[in-house]
Amino acid sequence: MLKKTITYTDYNGMERTEDFYFHLSKAELMEMEMSTTGGMEAYVEKIVNAQDAPAIVQTFKELILKAYGEKSLDGKRFEKSPEKADAFAQTEAYSELF
């Protein structure tokens, strides 16, 4: 799990510093690897070598949003959902990270 502290200005003009969490489980990594022709590592290498900016940006965005989540209060779960990822993507913290 990666904890990233991000300082950003919210839409009320208030500067905020918050911790955000990102994690891809072994199962998620395996799924990404197996669902990408030739594997995820080879795909990333290919688009970087080709300097395919649109594909690089799209892949980076997908990785960030797929990894974003919130730790449960008891620390036993890392809670993810499309709604949580979408809410994060609508913040200036996401823009700062991106």
Where are these predicted regions, by residue range?
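Short, charged/polar N-terminal "headpieces" of proteins
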Residues: 1-43
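Acidic, low-complexity intrinsically disordered segments
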Residues: 41-98
